[in-house]
């Protein structure tokens, strides 16, 4: 009788995090938190949190593929969360119109989950960005009282301002557009 002995292989469990080389630390930490929470949700069998996080990770992966030559940072994550929250709010409006209260509740819970991740990012809040933009616009108004909105965008140093404000360029542009009329009237 022949006996085959298979040597036992001792495997060690290691976790690997694959992120883009040029990503900021805030971005890396945000992705790591999402993946860790996904594992926890799977173990807890929390389907709502699990599907929400999977959707977020999928959206982020698509964003990485679309912007393969650009640096990714926490501002990209903030914009992704803002977009997903906006989509959920639009869905809630449609579901209320069609009297689908079960789906309204599901979308509202997803918004809470997304907002928790959005507030955890080291990014300035909308109010903080608006306050700083108003200050910048009033300084511009003092030096050039008849400046146009297009010219304001040209006067801003887009390489340093997002870092100073801890906000994405898209959030800053949106804030400038909304605050311009208030300051220049």
Curated annotation (Swiss-Prot):
It holds the Pfam family YqeY. Residues 1-21 form a transit peptide. The keyword Mitochondrion applies. The keyword Acyltransferase does not apply. GO terms for molecular function: carbon-nitrogen ligase activity, with glutamine as amido-N-donor. Keywords: Mitochondrion, Transit peptide. InterPro entries: Asn/Gln_tRNA_amidoTrase-B-like, YqeY/Aim41, YqeY/Aim41_N. GO terms for cellular component: mitochondrion. Its main location: mitochondrion. It is found in: Mitochondrion. Belongs to the AIM41 family. PANTHER family: ALTERED INHERITANCE OF MITOCHONDRIA PROTEIN 41, MITOCHONDRIAL (PTHR28055:SF1). This is Altered inheritance of mitochondria protein 41, mitochondrial. It comes from Kluyveromyces lactis (strain ATCC 8585 / CBS 2359 / DSM 70799 / NBRC 1267 / NRRL Y-1140 / WM37) (Yeast).
């Amino acid at each position: 009788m022949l006996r085959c002995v298979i040597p036992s292989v001792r495997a060690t469990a290691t976790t690997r995090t694959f992120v883009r080389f040029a990503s900021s630390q805030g971005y890396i930490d945000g992705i790591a938190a999402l993946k860790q929470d996904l594992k926890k949700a799977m173990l807890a069998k929390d389907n709502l949190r699990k599907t929400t996080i999977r959707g977020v990770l999928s959206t982020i992966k698509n964003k990485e593929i679309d912007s393969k030559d650009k640096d990714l940072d926490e501002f990209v994550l903030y914009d992704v969360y803002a977009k997903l929250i906006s989509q959920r709010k639009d869905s809630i409006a449609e579901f209320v119109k069609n009297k689908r209260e079960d789906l309204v509740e599901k979308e509202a819970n997803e918004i809470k989950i997304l907002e928790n991740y959005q507030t955890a990012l080291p990014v300035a809040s909308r109010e903080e960005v608006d306050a700083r933009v108003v200050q910048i616009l009033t300084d511009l108004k003092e030096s050039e009282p008849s400046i146009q909105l297009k010219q304001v965008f040209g006067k801003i140093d887009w390489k340093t301002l997002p870092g100073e404000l801890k906000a994405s360029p898209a959030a800053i542009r949106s804030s400038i557009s909304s605050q311009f009329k208030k300051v220049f009237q």
